[in-house]
């Protein structure tokens, strides 16, 4: 059969090469029963096939690749002579001929042909961002614009990465099926669990991680689940300590051999030099009965999930109970002449009492009287006395209903609170999380031990990072990098499965674009309440001038918007999870931040042991102040009044808005103890 005119697919054969049988067939025709009669070139015999087993496709469409890209299994393909698309209903199959004469047949799900180049999305947005990179990008020692070079490496035809939607593509962001089992080898709480689930089921997800809420822990759990599914992961940040923190936590669990810390030339060179040509011994990671541990992890996740739901419900019920008691108190004062005939309403469901109360209040407002049918209906539901009270004194009956509702709802909440509290006490959340963490980590290590069998390991050169990217990512599925170097870590024909962008509030828009171009999915992590990236006055003038020239949407304003802020406004359909549980500061310190900046949404998980002066203000007296970026009076107060009180009480940190002030303090104290808000942000100090 002519493979350019028809395609015969044997659906019973799962392997790509075996299921396409066109070139093996001499003739094909339909039998009277509706099946297929086939004669192969290798035999004169005629074989009969069930109709459902074979697809006989004709009239292929020649695909025009002009201004389009071809990607097979997410790898960019060049040197294509011809693409034929065979279609039937929702199924597509491709026959691809390369310029060297080689041909291959592929399932449609393995082939992606782009629609519109991403530089054509969103009007002038791409040109604007590229201009920002050209005019304000960081330069290396040889005065080469690093950012502009990164922009030139972006594959503009690849429109199935999040950058496309960021630039204005109206295509809906993809969602993914939830994995059958999600693992938490680094521990979890309610909001971290929600953040991990959102990351695994959405092309783009955003995690707001205020300080001390376990942001790194959440990132590690996402990485672990992606590793279990054999995905490649790029972790980027403008802050070196953020990616190093991820590396350290992975090393603590013996997983550092999966990590390649790349980015700039120095890091790449160090990685190449330090490669170990064999795998670590992972025999002890292999489980004799992984199914038992898997079942335990599943059971513990179900218990923990229920307990998280219980905790949330407990908090809601407590809030409702407190509000109800306050309402009841004022209602009792107002209805001092409560009708005593309400005992018969005891133990009636509060929802029914509220329903009738709303009906009665509406009738009073509309000066109506209840019909006989309505009175009979409610007397049937709540009891016979309802009939006479509805027909006689409606206002008095409203007072009875109000009192009965408060008593009924109060009793219901108390029962629910008691049941949930008992359940939480019985299950022991802390113990269950420990068992979930332990079993998850065992399964992760078991899977890795099975995948990376001990023995010799491939050693890569700098060129291999580009030319053998697929093989490299199988060996090192976790790559760490600066955001600036996001798309220079592997060859341009490849992208990562996921990019995780940490400290996104400190990344500027033009740099964040690079990271969105080099992965199929993005997890954007930051905190829009923290300080954004610093924009100098000189840079702001240049940025505003460029924006005025291109007239772009304000969501791309590089002066007023960090990358995180832009993403929050652009990716409206992406889930945003706030990590609420705070583990670092004293409750009084975090509660100040909570009320001032986080609308009371954070939950302190630390204990207030009644310490004195946890948070205090020291006012300086008049004299020797400066109006600029240096203040000698404040330095004197710090040295003479503040430090003597805390010098023997653990580590200290001094934060000041200005670098000049920090340098002066460090010079006088002869130690690196003071820094600016930007430098300290995200660092951990016991006292500061």
Model-predicted regions and their roles:
Residues 1-62, 257, 264-269, 277-424:
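Charged C-terminal transducer/switch regions of large nucleotide-driven machines
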Residues 38, 44-198, 268-289, 449-456:
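Pre-P-loop entry segment of helicase/translocase ATPase cores
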Residues 98, 129, 142, 264, ...:
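Flexible glycine-/small-residue-rich
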Residues 119-187, 311, 354-495:
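Conserved helicase NTPase catalytic core signature
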Residues 168-258, 468-523:
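Secondary-structure-rich domain cores
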Residues 185, 233-236, 286-293, 300-303, ...:
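Hydrophobic alpha-helical scaffolding
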Residues 213, 218, 222-225, 229-250, ...:
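Conserved RecA-like ASCE P-loop NTPase motor core of nucleic-acid helicases/translocases
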Residues 484-498, 505-688:
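Conserved helicase motor core of SF1/SF2 NTP-dependent helicases
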């Amino acid at each position: 059969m002519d493979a350019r005119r028809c395609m015969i697919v044997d659906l019973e054969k799962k392997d790509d090469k075996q299921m396409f049988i066109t070139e093996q067939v001499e003739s094909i025709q339909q039998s009277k029963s509706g099946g297929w009669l086939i004669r192969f070139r290798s035999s004169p015999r005629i074989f009969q096939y069930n109709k459902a087993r074979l697809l006989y496709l004709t009239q292929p469409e020649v695909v025009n690749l002009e201004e389009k890209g071809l990607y097979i299994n997410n790898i960019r393909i060049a040197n294509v002579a011809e693409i034929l698309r065979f279609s039937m209903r929702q199924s597509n199959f491709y026959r691809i001929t390369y310029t060297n004469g080689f041909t291959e047949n592929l399932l449609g799900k393995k082939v992606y042909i782009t629609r519109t180049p991403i530089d054509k999305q969103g009007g002038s947005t791409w040109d604007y961002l590229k201009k920002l990179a050209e005019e304000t990008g960081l330069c290396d020692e040889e005065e080469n614009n690093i950012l502009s070079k990164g922009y030139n490496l972006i594959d503009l035809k690849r429109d199935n990465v999040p950058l496309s939607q960021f630039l204005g593509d109206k295509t809906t962001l993809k969602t993914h099926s939830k994995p059958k089992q999600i693992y938490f080898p680094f521990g979890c709480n309610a909001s971290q669990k929600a953040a991990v689930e959102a990351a695994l089921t959405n092309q783009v997800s955003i995690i707001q991680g205020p300080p001390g809420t376990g942001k790194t822990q959440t990132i590690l759990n996402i990485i672990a689940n992606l590793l279990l599914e054999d995905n490649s992961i790029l972790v980027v940040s403008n802050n070196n300590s953020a990616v190093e923190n991820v590396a350290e936590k992975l090393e603590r669990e013996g997983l550092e051999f999966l990590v390649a810390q790349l980015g700039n030339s120095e890091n790449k060179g160090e990685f190449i030099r330090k490669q170990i040509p064999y795998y670590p011994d992972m025999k002890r990671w292999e489980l004799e009965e992984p199914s038992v541990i898997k079942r335990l992890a599943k059971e513990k996740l179900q218990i923990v999930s229920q307990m998280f739901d219980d905790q949330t419900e407990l908090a809601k019920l407590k809030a409702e109970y407190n509000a109800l008691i306050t309402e009841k108190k004022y209602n009792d004062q107002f209805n001092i002449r409560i009708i005593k005939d309400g005992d018969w309403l005891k133990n009636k469901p509060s929802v029914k009492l509220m329903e009738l109360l709303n009906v009665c209040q509406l009738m009073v407002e509309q000066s109506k009287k209840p019909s006989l049918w309505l009175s009979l209906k409610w007397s049937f539901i709540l009891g016979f006395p309802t009939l006479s009270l509805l027909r006689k004194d409606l206002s008095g009956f409203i007072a009875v209903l109000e009192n009965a509702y408060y008593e009924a709802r109060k009793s219901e909440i108390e029962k629910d609170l008691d049941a949930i509290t008992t359940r939480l006490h019985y299950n022991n959340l802390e113990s269950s999380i420990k068992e979930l963490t332990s079993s998850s980590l065992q399964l992760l290590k078991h899977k890795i031990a099975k995948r990376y069998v001990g023995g010799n390991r491939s050693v890569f050169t700098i060129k291999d990072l580009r030319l053998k990217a697929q093989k490299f990512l199988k060996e090192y599925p976790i790559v760490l990098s600066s955001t600036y170097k996001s798309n220079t870590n592997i060859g341009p024909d490849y992208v990562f499965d996921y990019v995780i962008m940490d400290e996104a509030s400190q990344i500027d828009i033009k740099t964040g674009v690079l990271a969105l171009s080099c992965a199929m999915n993005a997890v954007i992590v930051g905190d829009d309440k923290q300080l954004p990236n610093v924009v100098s006055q000189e840079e702001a003038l240049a940025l505003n001038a460029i924006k005025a020239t291109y007239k772009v949407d304000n969501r791309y304003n590089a002066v007023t918007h960090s990358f995180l802020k832009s993403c929050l406004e652009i990716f409206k359909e992406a889930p945003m999870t706030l990590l609420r549980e705070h583990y670092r500061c004293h409750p009084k310190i975090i509660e100040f931040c909570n009320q001032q900046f986080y609308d009371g949404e954070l939950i302190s998980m630390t204990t207030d042991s009644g310490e004195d002066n946890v948070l205090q203000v020291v006012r300086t007296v008049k004299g020797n102040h400066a109006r600029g970026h240096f203040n000698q009076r404040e330095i004197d107060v710090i040295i003479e009044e503040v430090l003597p009180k805390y010098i023997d009480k653990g580590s200290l940190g001094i934060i000041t808005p200005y670098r000049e002030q920090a340098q002066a303090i460090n010079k006088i104290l002869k130690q690196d103890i003071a820094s600016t808000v930007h430098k300290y942000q995200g660092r951990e100090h016991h006292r500061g």
